[in-house]
Design a protein with these regions (language model features):
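A generic structural signal for beta-strand entry/edge sites
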Residues: 24-26, 117, 248
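Short linear proline/tyrosine/threonine-rich motifs used for host-factor recruitment
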Residues: 120, 250-253
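Preference for solvent-exposed, low-hydrophobicity sequence contexts
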Residues: 150-247, 254-269
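A short, sequence-level motif marking secondary-structure junctions
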Residues: 5, 134-138, 266-269
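Short glycine/proline-centered loop/turn elements that form peptide/ligand docking sites
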Residues: 2, 18-25
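Acidic, glycine-rich catalytic/binding loops that coordinate metals and/or anionic ligands
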Residues: 30-160
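Short, well-structured beta-strand-loop connectors
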Residues: 2-15
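Active-site proximal loops enriched in glycine and acidic residues that flank catalytic Cys/His/Asp
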Residues: 17-20, 31-33
Length: 270
């Protein structure tokens, strides 16, 4: 990189070196609003980065690293990226093994509307699962349709997925309170919302294992949804999520000793 060059995202700015006065290589950088020497430094957060601690890896989003933090950019795993980088026109077909031995087939399609909102459409249940994505992750924004549908379970399973694989790393987030709550509880929460939130629906996804070889690649993940009222866990959903050969191969839903197994019976069609 030379003075005056135009930069784009992903360009290498510098290599980490040693000035001779430091015991280890390091790099200094700052953000400023104007290109002039001596301009004020902006106190600005970084989008997504990985914090490496003694306990393992931790995703940080829109935060600022602390002194002595060991950080790295998110290293994209192509298997995860291709599986969760949904493209309009892409189609999926899942066979769901339901409690009681029944089996049903569901066809989904990725759609973009005239406002460029992207969502997964289920023809059988007339349900929509809206999503957004950036260079580092895919995340669902909201669901419209039947809450007992396979698409809704997929919403709960893969609410937020980072494209990078870091073993045992956990992603944590929360759903809107009306996702799995209704009736009097929602009315009461709306009334006291300015003071405190006693309803919480927590989401957690954990990266379990990864296998790579010349002909195949696979990644296993587990996720959980925990509905809490006043700090007490009232209901839990447990999920597994399997990625094979760059596509979502299978996901399972366990709730109240009932298990739903959804198997992708064809690779995504473009």
């Amino acid at each position: 990189m030379q003075k005056g060059d135009t930069l784009k995202k992903g360009d290498i700015l510098a290599h980490c070196g040693n000035s001779g006065r430091s015991p280890q290589p390091h790099i200094h950088f700052q953000l400023q609003a104007t290109p002039f020497i001596g301009s004020k430094t902006l106190d600005y957060p970084l989008g997504h980065y990985i914090l490496n601690t003694d306990k393992g890896y931790e995703l940080k989003s829109f935060e600022k690293p602390e002194k002595d933090d060991k950080v790295t950019a998110v290293e994209k795993n192509q298997t995860l990226y291709k599986a969760f980088h949904f493209i309009p026109g892409q189609q999926f077909e899942f066979e769901a093994a339901l409690p009681g031995g029944q089996k049903k087939t569901y066809k989904w399609e990725v759609v973009a509307d005239i406002y460029n909102n992207t969502y997964i459409w289920c023809e059988a249940t007339h349900s929509k699962l809206f999503f957004k994505s950036d260079d580092d992750m895919m995340y669902f924004t909201h669901f419209e349709g039947k809450r007992r549908s396979l698409l809704f379970y997929f919403y709960l399973t893969a609410y937020k997925v980072l494209y990078g694989y870091y073993k045992d790393m956990e992603l944590k987030d929360s759903f809107p309170v009306n996702t799995l709550n209704s009736g009097l509880l929602i009315l009461l929460q709306d009334f006291v919302a300015p003071f405190f939130m006693f309803l919480k629906t927590n989401y957690q996804l954990k990266y379990i294992s990864k296998k790579d070889d010349f002909t195949d690649s696979s990644i296993e993940m587990q996720s959980q949804v925990d509905i809490r009222v006043g700090g007490i866990s009232m209901k839990k959903y447990n999920f597994t999520l399997s990625v094979r050969k760059d596509h979502i191969a299978e996901f399972t839903v366990t709730h109240k000793n009932k298990i739903v197994v959804a198997t992708n019976i064809n690779k995504p069609l473009s």
